[in-house]
Structure formats: C-alpha cells, structure tokens
Amino acid sequence: MTINTKNIVVVGAGVFGVSVANHLYRELGGTYAIKLVTASNYVYFLPSAVRLTVSKDYTKSILPLKNVLDSGIEVIKDTAASFDDKEVVLGSDRAIKFDILVLATGSKWADPIGSTYTFGDNYKEYFEREASRISDADHILFLGGGFVNCELAGELLFKYLEEIRSGKKRISIIHNSDKLLPDSGLYNDTLRKNVTDYLSKNGITLYLNTVGASLDTSPKRIFLGEGSSKYIDADLIYRGVGISPNVPVNSISDLCDKKGFIQVEKNFRVKAVEAGNVFAIGDVTNFRYHGLVKRDNWVDVLTRNVISSLQEGTEASLVDADCLETGHAPSGVSLGPNAGFGQFPLPLLGTINIPSFLISRAKSKNLFSDKMEPLFKK
C-alpha cells in the first residue's frame, strides 16, 4: 500500500489548472497526493464565453469538473484566502500544507464574462441576468476596446443588428488608442484597423484616443477624459480595461509586478519564493502573452519542472517555456459567428493577415467550443 506523504496543491480550475493537475497525477499519482482547489463543481471555457451574452447554450462554455479531471485527484471545493511558501489557507480557514504549490488562479473578469469565482455553481443565474440586462438596455457602453470587449461587441452586433441600424439600440466603446485592441505589440496594425473599421462601419460608436472617467454621484455618466465637460450617458456600462490577475492574499515581498501579476521565470517558478516550491501559470503571471496558443508547451514544461524540483530541490535544472517574449501573437478576433479577423507570424516572412472567411470558419462559428473538453482533459 502506497502512503501519500507529500502534497502537490494546484489552485484554480481553468484550462491550465485542470491540465496541470491531470498531468501531474498521471506522472506522480502513485507517490504524491494531487489536490485541486476550486470554487466550483464546473469548469468555464473563456474563449467561448462571449457568446453566453446572447445564447443559453451553456454546454459550449461550461462542463462538469468531473468530466475533465482524472478521478484520483482530490477536489477541494473552496477558495484560496491566503498562502505562503508552506501552506495555503482556504476561505473555510482550513490550512493545507504543500511540497509544491501551483497557482493557476487566472484573472478576475468583469461582467458580463465573470468567472467561477464570481458565480460558483450558479452560472445559469449569472448569465441569464447579464443577458437580460443587455436585452433591456438602450445604450450599452464598453470602457476599453481590448480583445474581449471587441468580441463582445461583435456578438451584440450580430444579435441586435437591426435594432442598432434603426437607432433603437446603441453600443459604444471608449478606447485609449487610435485603433481597437491593445497597443501592446501583440497585434499588428492591420488586424487592429480591420477590427476597428468593421465595428465602426456596422454601427458601433467609437471614442478613440479617449479615457473614460466617472463620478460616484453619476454612475451612468462617463466623461470623455479626466476633467472633461464632455460626457455620454448609458444605461449599461461594462468596465473591461485590461485583465485583473487573481492573486490570493500573501505577505511575500516582491511577489507581483506593478500591475499585480505574479513575477515568474520562464520555467514558471515564482521569482520571489526562495524555496523554489511555488509555481504559477496562465493569466495570473507576468508573461507578456496570456492565452491558449502555447497551452501544450506550457503544461508539459511546468509538469517536467515540478517533477525536477521534487527530485532535486532548488538545484534542479529547469527548462524554459516558449512564452512569446517578442513579436506578434497568433490571433483570431471573432466578431460574431460570421465575422472575424486574424494574424499569424511566420519566421522570416513576418506576420501575415488571415482572411475573414478563414477566421469565421476556424474560430467565429464555434469559438473553439469543440476543443473545450480536450484542452482541459488531454
């Protein structure tokens, strides 16, 4: 009989958390106890979540956790309230000691996307409420024209096209650059211009090179710049300016960068933890790129590095992941089920632009929902 005397704790049940837990269990399950901390009995697939604002087909974005998690992994339904380099304290005040900790806590996505931290098991109630708010609103305003808000606007444009054209329903975006999508170097100007032009030409009102400001006394009024007298009123305002990393409370000095992301090496080891037994992966890290393009490489590298750390400690020779430190990222922006634009960087040739019909076929139609289960499970 094997006695599990050592704990590997994974916090977060997104694609990376579940995948890493599965891989570690398959490699180490006979020797180590693999524990997964999650706030929900379900997993939530963010790439297809934008369509839940206009559709109730939850099966394309939500799955029971048990369907994608190896059965030998211990599920702890709770939240991580705090942690140090020895233990995680849960929301229930239970403390779990660990030999290795993997933080895959992701980001806190604003409404109407949310997360399992937001809605737990009550996803139907959450999305039905958001869909109702959207349906009832005459003017919907997005603060920030990043990737998710552009895709949300595309979904609403498809759903409410006739109402938008008639002026019965208005959708606006305030963005701090001259083109939509982040001016971060991940997206080329052609992709950004294509997305901007498509939304603008189809009735979405854009306020570019502008930062929205609000007052507590007028929550439905957004001023077009700090100190500006110009403003717009909207009965539904969604604030989506960048992602907000979901980092549990801790007292570890210099754990996060100025934006709140956990600082990690390219091997996923957390820089601020001298013991070398804490790793982080996914949206919670300070990697330049956040997404699933490198999912297979990242999961394999982290699994290998955790095993090396268990065997050799701080002296372990860890391998680096391909983290897209420079250049453009392979990207497809869906703008409803029948529209979208994309780009793909090629060695020596540079970044090529992917025709809209190919993005529509490859991504927009199903938003990768057909790949959801394997991305968690494999």
From Swiss-Prot:
GO BP, sorted A to Z: apoptotic process; positive regulation of apoptotic process; response to singlet oxygen
Protein name (record): Apoptosis-inducing factor 1
Broad EC category: oxidoreductase
A matching Pfam family: Pyr_redox_2
EC identifiers of the protein: 1.-.-.-
Additional note from the record: Present with 1560 molecules/cell in log phase SD medium.
Location in or out of the cell: Mitochondrion outer membrane; Nucleus
Membrane found in the keyword field: yes
Keywords from the named record: Apoptosis, FAD, Flavoprotein, Membrane, Mitochondrion, Mitochondrion outer membrane, Nucleus, Oxidoreductase, Transmembrane, Transmembrane helix
